Amino acid sequence: MSENQQALNHVVSMEDLTVDQVMKLIKRGIEFKNGAQLPYEDHPIVSNLFFEDSTRTHKSFEVAEIKLGLERLDFDVKTSSVNKGETLYDTILTLSALGVDVCVIRHPEVDYYRELIASPTITTSIINGGDGSGQHPSQSLLDLMTIYEEFGHFEDLKVAIAGDLDHSRVAKSNMQILKRLGAELFFAGPEEWRSQEFADYGKFVTIDEIIDQVDVMMFLRVQHERHDSGAVFSKEDYHAQHGLTQERYDRLKETAILMHPAPINRDVEIADHLVEAPKSRIVQQMTNGVFVRMAILESVLASRNAN
């Protein structure tokens, strides 16, 4: 393990990480991106349990595990005893008893991991791949890595996060750590989808008020599956009022970058032809997801080896 890396027992929330730990994970992710290798001779076992749909998080964790030479124990929710009524706790208790070292979990219940990491019987380490509208630490870390690669710092950067704020675990993870890192935060999007908790971290604005001032413009997916009622906006109205149109893109500073955690509703949050525009770092975010997740896995496994 790199001497610059600091071990963690679990990675479940950005609130639990220190700035020092965050920076070490970012820098280790960059080292992996630049070719650093870490073969494991003792073949640690990792199981990925996704109770919500996922492409980027699920598959990039798998690629990270392959690159690290870890043993993957596939877990298919559809064919597991979950369908017989088994609880998440008993599922993880079973995998822990079988000798699984790390479980990467995405689950619709906010804070699902609290019961697991508090258990004296469960010895497997937990990496949170997203808990409902709660936290998404690995996405936040890959976003931070992407910003750090671009600017080399966070202090005094103006970052706007726009879209479905209340339902976004990405927004909540990023706002907490970006403020601690010294960035200035702005929040845009429909008033119906932003709660007062965001006011503790930044300023509410309209996208047109801030678009030409920001260094980082981060859009969020409209999460239809987390809304209780029907659509408040048509796709066309949402895009016109809150999305990235060509006119808004043209107003971005020359050095500004465009981000989105994906999946993207094209022509809703971002105009289709702008998803891969020169200022876009969306593909880079996906690439960086592999390397920062390698750093997370390395750190968690190092903690286990130290205990």
Swiss-Prot record:
One of its GO terms (molecular function) is aspartate carbamoyltransferase activity. Carbamoyl phosphate binds at residues 56-57, 106, 136, 139, 262-263. Pathway: Pyrimidine metabolism; UMP biosynthesis via de novo pathway; (S)-dihydroorotate from bicarbonate: step 2/3. It catalyses: carbamoyl phosphate + L-aspartate = N-carbamoyl-L-aspartate + phosphate + H(+). One of its GO terms (biological process) is 'de novo' UMP biosynthetic process. GO terms for cellular component: cytosol. HAMAP family: Asp_carb_tr. Belongs to the aspartate/ornithine carbamoyltransferase superfamily. ATCase family. This is Aspartate carbamoyltransferase catalytic subunit. It comes from Streptococcus pneumoniae serotype 19F (strain G54).
